[in-house]
């Protein structure tokens, strides 16, 4: 451990930051399909932020309700976000499988960014 690590460990972390990190961890490992490579990272970051903030994008009411239920239960549900015309006129999907199932085991939960 270097000196900076020791200093950082001594700084108390605000509870809201701990809560945010715990929330983000419930989305598991974030991965993308190879087709997403041309999409600028700024766009991907914005879409991921929307997804983890429960802005599901361009979904029908039924899919929104399913997302809201899975998000509320945190019991391994699926979350889908669809963002029309997100890049080059194309829709981008972000799908979280196993949301909140076991935040300490990222193999059980992951979020994938892809074109439909």
Which positions does each model-derived feature cover?
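Short intrinsically disordered terminal tails
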Residues: 1-4, 115-116
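Compact soluble domain cores
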Residues: 5-81
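Short, compact, well-ordered microdomains
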Residues: 72-116
């Amino acid at each position: 451990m270097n000196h900076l690590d020791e200093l950082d460990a001594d700084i108390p972390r605000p509870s809201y930051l701990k809560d945010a990190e715990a929330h983000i961890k419930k989305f598991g490992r974030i991965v993308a399909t190879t087709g997403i490579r041309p999409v600028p990272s700024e766009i991907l970051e914005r879409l991921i932020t929307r997804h983890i903030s429960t802005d599901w994008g361009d979904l029908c009411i039924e899919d929104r309700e399913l997302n809201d239920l899975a998000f509320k239960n945190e019991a391994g549900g699926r979350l889908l976000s669809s963002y029309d015309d997100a890049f080059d006129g194309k829709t981008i999907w972000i799908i979280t499988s196993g949301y909140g199932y076991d935040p300490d085991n990222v193999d059980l939960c992951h979020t994938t960014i892809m074109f439909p």
